[in-house]
């Protein structure tokens, strides 16, 4: 998602 982080699961 738009808030995806490289060190977190997609969408978080």
Curated annotation (Swiss-Prot):
One of its GO terms (molecular function) is serine-type peptidase activity. Keywords: Hydrolase, Protease, Serine protease. The keyword Transmembrane does not apply. The keyword Nucleotide-binding does not apply. Its EC number is 3.4.21.-. It is an enzyme of class 3 (hydrolase). One of its GO terms (biological process) is proteolysis. Belongs to the peptidase S8 family. Serine protease. This is Alkaline protease Cc3. It comes from Coprinus comatus (Shaggy mane).
């Amino acid at each position: 998602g738009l808030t995806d982080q490289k060190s977190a699961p997609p969408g978080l």
